[in-house]
Amino acid sequence: MVTTRCLCVILTLWMVSSRPSASILPGAPSFGAWWGTPESRKIARQADNARRTGDLASAETYYRQGYDDAVHRHDERAMVGYLNGIAACQITQLRYSAALVTLLEAKSHAKAIGDRADLGAIAVNLSNVYLQVRDLDAARKVLEDGRAALSSLRRPYFMPNLLIQLGRSHDIQQDGMARSFYRQGIDAAREFGDRQLEALGLDLLGEERLGQGDLNEAAKVIEEGMHLRERFSPKDLDLSWWRMGDLKSRQGDWEEAARYTDLALNAKGAAPEYRLKHQRGMIRMAMGDRAGALADLREAVQLSSRWRLEVLPASSSLTAANEMLDGFVFSSFIEAAASEALRTGNQRWAAEAFEAVELNRAASLRESRSLADAWHKRVPAEYWDTLARLRRADVEALAKHAPNDESRRLRLELAEMEAKAGLGFLTKNSENFYDQTSLIHFQQGLRTTEVVLSFYLGDRESYLWAVTRDTLKLQKIAAAEKIRGEVGGFEDAVQAGRPEAVELGERLYQELFGQLGQEAVAKPSWLLSLEGILFEAPFAALVTEQKGGKVSYLVSKHSVQTIPGALLLSTRPDAGIGRFLGVGDPIYNAADPRWGEQKKPASFLNLFHTPTTAGTAQTGQYGRLVGSSEELKTSAANWGSQSTILLEGAAARRDMFVGELANGPSIVHLATHVIYPLGKQQGYIAFGLGPEGRSEFLTTTDVASLRVPGAFVAMTGCGTGTGDPRPGAGLIGFTRAWQMAGASAVLATSWPVRDSRGDIFASFYNHLRNASPAEALRLSQIDMLDSGTWRAVPSYWAPYQITGGAR
């Protein structure tokens, strides 16, 4: 049985609103003042009583009354306490977005009065919110704040909670340190007399032990936690029954596993229902109850989709949440439903499995794109200042070849501002989205020339759905590991120009598409919904057949477009021959004669070069892109717009480019270097030297914050189409960032391409005047294939790809 550890575990932190004043470090201002009026004491008692009976709505109402009273008395310390009580209610009800805003307000007040103890507690609460949605970077940063507060205080009241939170963080990282932190937190909770927290710590340690395969210790600590709850907090027993159900499943005792899981479900307590439904579905599947299992797993998907509406509306949290949901809830249902469809021929399960694949895949980008509009309207002015500071911090990180603490801190600040700006927007739009995802609605939007080919890669077997306007066909293909090997070998052979690329391409084509029905094969427009290693496959160079010594490539028959998800398809706006904005041939080095003799400070790009001896002058690592100037000119000429802006040489500056975007170009063409010194997810578009002699750049974070509504974007630099493939979220990189910025489609490269005059782009823009981007790329690739020159080889034309939902 597949389970995921440390997800959506309720760590309710009531500590700020009910802590004794004796917990304050000697010398700090007395905290007892906020209980100092009869009204405040009455409110606190009412809130605690409501909380203990599980009436969280009433508890939150009482805490809000207390907060209003504290505001009236100008008592910031009391305001902090009540805000944390409100946040705890919100966290327990899985209202993470609201909890974030409440906690950030509490943090602001705590900073104003210099209360380190409150700040430490708030850091623990914030980490809880971030861990719930798997935003690990944000959680680590606020936990570091909590540890800093812990080191400056003597036995602060939040110490047990902090230690357990650190255990959760290390558990998710699986770095071997979780067990020690859990044990410390459990011991501290016992010393503080907090039996509820002690039981929760035992639960989490039990989950960690289950994940390590230590069933004996897991059983011991989970049962210990259950006995504690039986004695001190029986209303929380559903949390123990949930874990006991998981434990019994691991032990193969399916009857007991089902009994405990049913107990937890019937209790309707704090254990998340979608996790329990998923757990029972897997138990029923193991017991041979296919119908019951499918019903439970299907409901788990529906419940988790509603849970997603409460995820923090910041791009990092949305990506993490989709990745987490894909990892167990969606995958379990998809595999069960697809298997049932193939076993019985029941089209209902084939269709529902397809919808589940595409719902989770599309949600992350769609929600992030929607939020991008909200951010621009609602983020404070300091957001852009913070973004600029992050850019400077990234410069330092690049110079050191490693991320730095300042970058992490600033990214957290941006995420918090994004989340606050998106509140009230995500839920409304997401609810509309989920109401519109029926298969009929989707299929009616397809053209008669199109087929959507949607892949799901599984450990045991994978699946391919071929969906046209009238049909949906499901087929089983090889497991992910086999496909990974075949794609890797094929890509390497094509890139290197080796002759075995033909045989490997034909084999991979048969593996992926050999079972396609005639209707799908006949469709000229292929829309690919991908995951994992498939993002790296040069589909255009797949070999459909060899006959009489002649090789037929897929590109000869089909245009290929990678889509962010089948549920995100749209029609490309018809803007005519609109404005063309191009950037190319920047000045990358002070040695460039165009820079001028009077300006010779070191280039930023030189920072990547380490001199062999002290005092040796650094030389640039990146050469001039001489051919990019011709590429820009021929591309613009073949597009034929009456409004063309080409930023070359000294004009190829970041600020000039961003300024021109405000004029709404239809085409954005970037013929620049693109570098990935710190990993595929965060890249840098390198512009020319600025006034200080340092190169300027745009990161993927910067790009996602731009606005290019409806524009077509071409990035012809090295490997611009690469990124970090994330389950349930897609490829995280420049192509996704431009789509978040509003681009209708993006042309990018899978590997470095030889610098030339841009012949393929001259052909591409000529065809784009009368064709879709995917078809224009196909025709230009055929032009290269038939050219009889060195450009005819797949290693030249195959790495170009079109990504986007508009067609």
Pin down the residues of each PLM region:
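Conserved alpha-helical positions within TPR/SEL1-like repeat arrays
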Residues: 41-52, 78-92, 117-132, 157-171, ...
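Tetratricopeptide repeat
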Residues: 59, 65-66, 99-106, 139-146, ...
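A domain-level signal for caspase-like cysteine endopeptidase catalytic cores
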Residues: 143, 222, 489, 532-534, ...
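Amphipathic alpha-helical protein-protein interaction segments
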Residues: 290-553, 568-605
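Catalytic cores of nucleophile-dependent amide-cleaving enzymes
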Residues: 666-763
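An often Trp-containing, charged/polar helix-loop segment at the C-terminal end
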Residues: 756-807
